[in-house]
Design a protein with these regions (language model features):
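Short, exposed beta-strand/loop patches in secreted or surface proteins that constitute
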Residues: 32-33, 54-58, 78, 121-128, ...
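Gly/Pro-enriched, hydrophobic low-complexity segments
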Residues: 64-69, 122-175
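A short, compositionally biased
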Residues: 36-39, 80-83, 151-152
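An acidic-aromatic
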Residues: 57-113, 162-168
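Flexible, processing/modification-adjacent segments and terminal tails
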Residues: 29-34, 38, 87-142
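Sec-dependent signal peptide recognition
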Residues: 6-14
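Short polybasic amphipathic segments
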Residues: 42, 83-88, 155-157
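N-terminal leader/targeting segments and the immediate start of mature chains
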Residues: 2, 6-7, 19-62, 72, ...
């Protein structure tokens, strides 16, 4: 009887030890996939300039940015059609096969960051904090930080400190 008790006790202790050791392993957080194909609105600050715009961007690099505020620029659009670029305002359209916008232009900065983030390893996950997944990378417009929803991967904010650029995105939906 004592022998059966010792064997049973040893088995129970072994099982408890196995479960306690396995529960101590650190759980690696799931890294969200960054969603670069989306449409939404953005409040943009570039130095002293403040703009509101509508943004649409695909993972293939096709983008459209239309200014909605200030009133004197309302309706101006910047489009990258995957090799063809177009700027339009009040029925005036300039279309070219090369982007002539400087990399510090707000529309070019947004496009540069989103295009880079669409590339494999173009935006590197750094950490998660306050329900934000934080990604960093380098684009033609400068080093950037992207804040995305840690569950959905939808971009909420883009920063490029070198050109004093911030874009806060709202009403964003994956496309």
């Amino acid at each position: 009887m004592r022998r059966v008790f010792k064997i049973t006790f040893t088995v129970v202790v072994a099982i408890v030890l196995i479960f306690s050791i396995s529960s101590c392993t650190e759980k690696v957080p799931k890294i969200p996939e960054l969603v670069t194909g989306f449409s939404g609105n953005a409040d943009v600050e570039l130095g002293e300039t403040k703009l509101k715009c509508n943004i649409s961007h695909t993972e293939k690099g096709v983008s459209s940015i239309i200014i909605s505020s200030p009133e004197n620029l309302k309706g101006m659009s910047f489009k990258n059609l995957g090799g063809t670029y177009a700027i339009s305002y009040n029925e005036l359209i300039c279309e070219t096969e090369k982007s002539y916008l400087p990399s510090s232009c707000f529309a070019q900065a947004i496009t540069n960051v989103l295009d880079k983030a669409s590339e494999e390893n173009g935006a590197i996950y750094q950490k998660s904090e306050d329900n934000n997944a934080i990604f960093t990378g380098a684009s033609k417009s400068g080093d950037f930080t992207i804040y995305a929803d840690s569950k959905t991967g939808i971009i909420k904010k883009i920063e490029i400190p070198e050109i004093n650029f911030t874009a806060n995105l709202t009403d964003t939906k994956a496309i």
